[in-house]
Amino acid sequence: MPVSDFQPVIGLEVHAQLLTQSKIFCGCSTAFGAEPNRNTCPVCLGMPGVLPVLNQRVAEFAVRTGLALECTIRPTSVWSRKNYFYPDLPKGYQITQFDQPICEHGRLVIDTPQGEKAIRILRIHMEEDAGKSVHDAGGGQSLVDLNRAGVPLLEIVSQPDLRDADEAVEYLKAMRDVLVYLGVNDGNLEEGSFRCDANVSVMPKGSTTFGQRCELKNLNSFRFLKQAIEYEIARQVDVIESGGKVVQETRLWDVNKGVTRSMRSKEEAHDYRYFPEPDLPPLHVSAEAIAAAAKALPELPRAKLQRFTSQYGLPAYDARILTAERPLADYFEACAGHYKDYKKLSNWFLGELMRLLKEEGTPLSALRFTPAQLGELLGAVDQGMVSANAGKDVLGEMFRTGKAPADIIAEKGLAQVSDTGAIEAVVDDILAKNAGEIEKYRAGKKQVFGFFVGQVMRAMKGKGNPALVNELLKKKLGD
């Protein structure tokens, strides 16, 4: 049976570091990039005799995320110890949640070629992150950095509702957008603050019995997620077709070789010997707290995208880019209050503004001009006060200096000539000097029209209103 005769079954476990200033059970900083083992204390180092204290902000972020993903929030959730030995886990156990997580039974809607699809979310639970092992230290050594130990995490576990690698990528992108909009995570896959594991299995099409699943790790980009899942699907089908059985295991995506490699046998829950965390009381979340969190939720990416297409009449492509990041969407809406041709505004955003931000490496928050000034510039272009090309130059100067568009236009002499009489005088002069070209044009060589436009614009040093130049030339040439 070829791969096409099998149905992939995929679920994702998303691990999102929370944007708190301190760790989940102590006051150590969560800042990324500090000197190894600098952001540590007896609590996150697992020293004897210390007691954890829950960072309230972590619970607030968990409730906010659960509500955004349409989960049921448990009034009471319980902490557990997950026991395993690894060099970067100093206590020998991880404080997490097991059978009573804070959030359950949610969903996230994604777009597929067949339309919208709701991916069910099994659970969301809070836990502490482990440290980080560094295996390329040289000299055959592995080093341990415990700065990350105790950093607060949300683990968001989907049901196995994804059916191919593209759906998995779409789900992960949608999840990242939601978490970033909520302000609970920065969405950075490269630094590992937003990462995922994929559980992949295959079954013959038409079957209702899932195959044996393998967990894939080291998926630190959307591209690697897609490549790893596609490889693993083909690998499992090949194993089955060869008469073998897929072994439940954890496999590592090898970026250099483009394959998954066996890492270890896949553990079951009983392997971790979960038991209640004796040093932390159950977490109680009141109905009033849940209601307040629900009321404070921002407009989420999918709802904002739909509103941008309906309220502003934007194509789905434009709306998707503009709403991908909340600051960009907010800035567009601020500009829309000063300039009402929303499609043209979108074109300037997706073209010149995005180009300038990328080339200069400037965050949107550092823009030196106001939404009102951008609206003023686009209005000047519409009214013929400055050409579209000159308008781009003005925007670049606004970007670099923060000066008002009117001042830049005046200083650089970019004002466009829209005086009909002045343009007509230049047109008459050009036509009088090019009688031969006029004959060619009237004989059917219409491409000569571009020659006349160029001559007029050159004579006016590029400041002639193009629409008026074209109109007057056509009138004079008898069109």
UniProtKB/Swiss-Prot annotation:
Keyword field: ATP-binding, Ligase, Nucleotide-binding, Protein biosynthesis
Keyword Ligase: yes
MF GO annotations: asparaginyl-tRNA synthase (glutamine-hydrolyzing) activity; ATP binding; glutaminyl-tRNA synthase (glutamine-hydrolyzing) activity
SMART domains per the UniProt record, alphabetical: GatB_Yqey
PROSITE patterns given in the database record: GATB (PS01234)
GO biological process, one term: glutaminyl-tRNAGln biosynthesis via transamidation
Reactions listed under catalytic activity: L-glutamyl-tRNA(Gln) + L-glutamine + ATP + H2O = L-glutaminyl-tRNA(Gln) + L-glutamate + ADP + phosphate + H(+); L-aspartyl-tRNA(Asn) + L-glutamine + ATP + H2O = L-asparaginyl-tRNA(Asn) + L-glutamate + ADP + phosphate + 2 H(+)
EC number: 6.3.5.-
Record flagged with keyword Ligase: yes
Function description: Allows the formation of correctly charged Asn-tRNA(Asn) or Gln-tRNA(Gln) through the transamidation of misacylated Asp-tRNA(Asn) or Glu-tRNA(Gln) in organisms which lack either or both of asparaginyl-tRNA or glutaminyl-tRNA synthetases. The reaction takes place in the presence of glutamine and ATP through an activated phospho-Asp-tRNA(Asn) or phospho-Glu-tRNA(Gln).
PANTHER family cross-referenced by the UniProt entry: GLUTAMYL-TRNA GLN AMIDOTRANSFERASE SUBUNIT B MITOCHONDRIAL AND PROKARYOTIC PET112-RELATED, GLUTAMYL-TRNA(GLN) AMIDOTRANSFERASE SUBUNIT B, MITOCHONDRIAL
Family according to the record: Belongs to the GatB/GatE family. GatB subfamily.
Subunit-structure text: Heterotrimer of A, B and C subunits.
Name this protein carries in UniProt: Aspartyl/glutamyl-tRNA(Asn/Gln) amidotransferase subunit B
Originating species: Myxococcus xanthus (strain DK1622)
